[in-house]
Each structure stands twice: as structure tokens, then as C-alpha cells.
Amino acid sequence: MTKLENLMHEIFEKEGYEEYFVGPPIHGVGLEFEEPPLPAGHAFFHGEEPKDELKLGMVLSIGNCGLYLGEFGVRVEDTVVVTDKGYEEITAYSRTL
């Protein structure tokens, strides 16, 4: 998960948006609002140890970081479940404006 988190930071930096990238981008989903597994960035905010190992059936929110320009911003998350073939996206919103 740390590799994915680092890749997201690299993309924002490459595109010139690093200063607007707020918060860690990945966290587990379950009974609590944000829960393990938490990669390094998110674990730091929660005072926990990072857990990078992905296991079958884990549900993750990816993209939680938010992009803020001035007073307003947007926060879009994709929810996925880890499968034996990679992942299955379970988010059902449209990606078009």
C-alpha cells in the first residue's frame, strides 16, 4: 500500500498539484470511519503502525487525500475489495461530469 500511496504523491507532484494534496490517500473500510489496514501516511495520523500487507477480502478506500484549491476542494474515493486476481471496484458513481 505504501507503493500506491507514494505513486499517488508522485503523480500529483509531476502535475504540479503537490501543494494542494491534503492527507493520506488510502485506508481500510469496515465498521469504523477509517480503519486498518493503514499505510504509512494514514497510520501516522492515527498514531498506529503501518500495515502494508494486502490480504484477500480486504476493503480499501483509495483517493481519500482530497485536492484543495483555496477555500474549496474535492474529495473522491474509490472503494475496492482485494481479490485473487487483484481487486474488484465496488464504487458505483459515474466518472463523467
Residue ranges with predicted function:
Residues M1-L97:
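Active-site neighborhoods and metal-handling regions in enzymes and metal-associated proteins
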